[in-house]
Amino acid sequence: MDMLHNKCSDAIKSTSNSNLSNEVDKQKLQYDDLGNTGFSELFEMESQDNNDSIEDFLFFNINLTQEVEFENQRQYEHTKKTKKHNPFYVPSEVVREMVKKHALNGRI
């Protein structure tokens, strides 16, 4: 059993080592093919990508802000409707104050 296990583990090690060395060789070839000009061009492209990322982030931020404002407005409208139709409605601020007062008095 140990002999079979050793043969399997040796085969796995040699396969993983050959795959690793092939990957390293590929990376070296890609780096050698680029040369100095290719490397500087990649760097310039990255800086442009960063600017695009910043713009995307700003647009996302603006959209998110608008969505939050819209959601707040929707909740406000919903609250107004709820107050109108439900005589037992208590706003959350009032509930918070009541809980705070009870906590200070030691009832909770």
UniProtKB/Swiss-Prot annotation:
Membrane-spanning intervals of the chain: none
MF term (GO), any: promoter-specific chromatin binding
GO cellular component, one term: chromatin
A biological process from GO: cellular response to nitrogen starvation
Domain of life: Eukaryota
Basic and acidic residues biased stretches: 1-10
Signal peptide residue numbers: none
Polar residues composition bias: residue spans: 12-22
Region feature Disordered, mapped onto this chain: 1-27
Record's protein name: Putative uncharacterized protein YLR053C
Lineage of the species this protein comes from: Eukaryota, Fungi, Dikarya, Ascomycota, Saccharomycotina
